[in-house]
Amino acid sequence: MLDFAIFAVTFLLALVGAVLYLYPASRQAAGIPGITPTEEKDGNLPDIVNSGSLHEFLVNLHERYGPVVSFWFGRRLVVSLGTVDVLKQHINPNKTSDPFETMLKSLLRYQSGGGSVSENHMRKKLYENGVTDSLKSNFALLLKLSEELLDKWLSYPETQHVPLSQHMLGFAMKSVTQMVMGSTFEDDQEVIRFQKNHGTVWSEIGKGFLDGSLDKNMTRKKQYEDALMQLESVLRNIIKERKGRNFSQHIFIDSLVQGNLNDQQILEDSMIFSLASCIITAKLCTWAICFLTTSEEVQKKLYEEINQVFGNGPVTPEKIEQLRYCQHVLCETVRTAKLTPVSAQLQDIEGKIDRFIIPRETLVLYALGVVLQDPNTWPSPHKFDPDRFDDELVMKTFSSLGFSGTQECPELRFAYMVTTVLLSVLVKRLHLLSVEGQVIETKYELVTSSREEAWITVSKRY
């Protein structure tokens, strides 16, 4: 355990620490502007803790020192990039490794991955096909689950406050588990069991390992190990069941099983995808509905598009593709919420950004939360304005950051479709309304969420 680890208190601190733990440190500041270590042993960890989150620390750092900044995590140099221009200089569009996946694997202490370029290309293609095929095969299921939620909300009186975050997490768990892992999760008790174990694992990989508390608390450690073991056991059974057999329902795991992967790679990849997809889908659904409740004009425009595309007919995969404004709503949701505020890459070889040399084996952070609120790139950055994505150059910029197009992570692509179907079903029948006086505070972690429950009300359109 790193000697400075006890000071880490947030998920993202744990995330950065896990990556740094795996690689040698660079001790050169390389003349990059930034702050010197607050403490010799702990670097700028106290500053990050005092800021409340890594994202908020980076916002302040980039405001003070510009687009390329440096700080110290323990005795290790970290460089952060905070504008579109400098990110474009560093992002390699041909790079096949997914930093989100890499960091989660580090936290779970998984060892596979890091293969050759051809192997990584093959795995990326498997992921893409897995998402496409599972969404196509399970569209009717996704529609059914969306309509079940609609029926539940239609039964509420207009004055009833709906716990949005809770309902979206439940919806995401039910839809993702069945589409990724199959019919086992038609049983609500299996979904509840998965959600409980998922919550334990997701929480502990963020706080328990790096602050040392997990090893010191045997009860918590056993709970974590039991939860992870149960998740892995379920996945192993599903993988075994799906091997060498044909099913009418194609699930995400089928694509991995049919690829040239060993059992451990299939287990790890399906675990990462399951963990990440549930959270990203739940939070994207939550934030999209939150923003719609506070923007009557956007909700009206989305309703008109849904009516125009579907009319009185059913929601179909072909017509879903025509929802251009809905796509813009989701892109603007990701941008405004700063859904994934930080990403990272390890500097493989010495590189140059602007006039600054970045030493080899430096951890380079992509301060996406900073970039997505940069007024030089996004006019009126704090305004929820899906119309900004009518501009093709704006969409191209967004895609270059990995939030759409060929560079988006598969979990986000999956979440986009699930959320699109849900909104198509809900907005057609319901007005989504905010609760008067509610202030939603943001909690910045690996995936951004509301600090407390987000409440809404609904009323019938007809």
UniProtKB/Swiss-Prot annotation:
InterPro entries xref list: CYP450_20A1-like (IPR052666), Cyt_P450 (IPR001128), Cyt_P450_E_grp-I (IPR002401), Cyt_P450_sf (IPR036396)
GO CC terms: membrane
Membrane topology field: Single-pass membrane protein
Keywords: Heme, Iron, Membrane, Metal-binding, Monooxygenase, Oxidoreductase, Transmembrane, Transmembrane helix
Subcellular location as annotated: Membrane
Enzyme Commission identifier(s): 1.14.-.-
Pfam family, one: p450
Keyword Transmembrane set for record: yes
Transmembrane recorded as keyword: yes
Membrane-spanning segments: 4-24
Residues that bind heme: 409
Major localization listed first in the record, in broad terms: membrane
Gene Ontology terms for molecular function: heme binding; iron ion binding; monooxygenase activity; oxidoreductase activity, acting on paired donors, with incorporation or reduction of molecular oxygen
Necessary cofactors: heme
Sequence similarity: Belongs to the cytochrome P450 family.
Protein's recorded name: Cytochrome P450 20A1
